[in-house]
Amino acid sequence: MLYKRNLQLNKNGELIHLLSTEGLPKSILTQVLDTATNFVSIGDREVKKVPLLRGKSVFNLFFENSTRTRTTFEIAAKRLSADVINLDIAKSSAVKGETLLDTIANLSAMAADLFVVRHSESGAPYLIAQHVAPHVHVINAGDGRHAHPTQGLLDMYTIRHYKKDFSNLTVAIVGDVLHSRVARSDIHALTTLGCPEVRVVGPKTIVPGDMAPMGVRVCHTLEEGIKGADVIIMLRLQNERMSGALLPSSQEFFKSFGLTPEKLQLARPDAIVMHPGPINRGVEIDSAVADGTHSVILPQVTFGIAVRMAAMSIVAGNEA
């Protein structure tokens, strides 16, 4: 991890910031998943609100664009009855040269209780968490290629929902692992929750061989990677983070690593297919798979709201 290993926990071992799945004990991960279970049904109610964060102010600070993640955080906060402030960072003081910490100090002076931060620089949410007041909490909504803990947790929730238990699963993470903060968050969570086999799958240029110390099996062919898998997590190619020609072409990638109905037959008959989005159809996944019976991509989005509600309610309920 970057910075202090226990920055996310107070002296009693309670979650006060959610910055990474790395370093969090199994009990905390399970607490978030169990709490999310209580929130899933709220979306089906006529009044989709609970008063847990009434009177609290949640600031969404997205220095990097993400419609899906920002929207689900906003929905989650509003369902907890929080006041939500979305900052248009592109037009804000950050463009005018104000430092990140000066921005946070000014927003804290406006009585912020919780910052949801997405930033292109790895470690930015950690820096913020080190400098906020004891009653203020930080949730990392994605920092560089480092971590995306709520996506990792919603992936764990989805897996647990469909597979009940992690102890006998084989999970394959396929695609641009090198640039994926989701892959790192998933790997740390899966190993902590007791998944016995996690595979990372893709060409050598975007699936480094030195990932084995993370407790994963590295596979450089799709056939090896998904054979007998219970769960397949597809990742998009992050061309915006690639410097140089790491891949021949999208078409070549699809030919070798794109998940098609034919290739999916190598996995277990009851395998589920996941994707953090946005999907690039015809690049990492065939439409017939994305829209097929094995796909749980849309339920992931639904569960994401409940998981983000759980994360916000837990951190806001604990003092530093």
Swiss-Prot record:
- The species this protein belongs to is Albidiferax ferrireducens (strain ATCC BAA-621 / DSM 15236 / T118)
- Gene Ontology terms describing biological process: 'de novo' pyrimidine nucleobase biosynthetic process; 'de novo' UMP biosynthetic process; amino acid metabolic process
- What's the name of the protein? Aspartate carbamoyltransferase catalytic subunit
In terms of HAMAP family, this protein maps to: Asp_carb_tr
- Quote the catalytic activity from the record: carbamoyl phosphate + L-aspartate = N-carbamoyl-L-aspartate + phosphate + H(+)
What Enzyme Commission number does this protein have? 2.1.3.2
Q: Which lineage is the organism of this entry classified under, starting from the top rank?
A: Bacteria, Pseudomonadati, Pseudomonadota, Betaproteobacteria, Burkholderiales
Q: Keywords assigned by UniProt?
A: Pyrimidine biosynthesis, Transferase
- Superkingdom field: Bacteria
User: Is Transferase one of the keywords UniProt gives this record?
Assistant: yes
